[in-house]
Amino acid sequence: EHLSLNQEGQLNMIDLNIRALTHLARHYGAEMKKKGSGRILNVASIAGYQPGPKMAVYCATKAYVLSYTRALHSELKKSGVSVTALCPGFVETGFQEVAGMELGALELSGAVPADRVAKTAVKAMRKGRREVIPGLFNKPIPYANRLVPISLNLAVVKRLMS
C-alpha cells in the first residue's frame, strides 16, 4: 500500500520521472527547436493510462510523462522536433529472475522482450509518432480502460499487483 511505502523512495521516483524528465526535455527540446530538428523519447508506461493500487506514485508519474509528452509533441510539431512517449507493459529484462520474483503475472500479461521494446521505441521515435505501446497484448489496454467502470479497472490492477 502507498501509505506503507518508503516516502523517500516515492519522492525520488517523482524527482526522476517528473522533475528530471521535464528539465531534460525542456533543455534539449529548446536546443532542438533552435536547430529545427530533433527527436525526444520519454519513457512512460502502460501504467500511465490508469490509476494503480499498490503503485500509486509510479502510475501517477507515468501519467504525467504521458500527458506532458502529448502536450510537448503538439507544441513542437511544426518546429521539426517530435516527442514520443514509450508506453510498455511488463518487459522481460531478466531482472525478475535474478531478484527471485514470481513470473506468474509477467507470463500472463504478455511481457515483451527488452530488445523488442527498444526497437519498437526507436522506430516510433524516428517516425515522429506521439506515443507507442509495444506488444499486441498491451495495445488495447488504454481503450479497454475507457470502456470499463473505474472500480473494475482498479480491482483488476490491484489483483495483478498482488
Q: What is each model feature region?
A:
Residues E1-S4, E8-D15:
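Active-site Tyr-X3-Lys motif and surrounding loop/helix of classical short-chain dehydrogenase/reductase
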Residues A25, T61:
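Active-site helix of classical SDR
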Residues H27-G36:
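A short helix-coil junction within the Rossmann-fold of NAD(P)-dependent oxidoreductases
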Residues E31, Q50, A71-V81:
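Active-site-adjacent segment of SDR/Rossmann-fold oxidoreductases
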Residues S45:
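Residue(s) in the substrate-gating loop at a strand-loop-helix junction
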Residues G52-A56:
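Active-site loop immediately N-terminal to the catalytic Tyr-X3-Lys motif
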Residues E75-F137:
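SDR active-site lid
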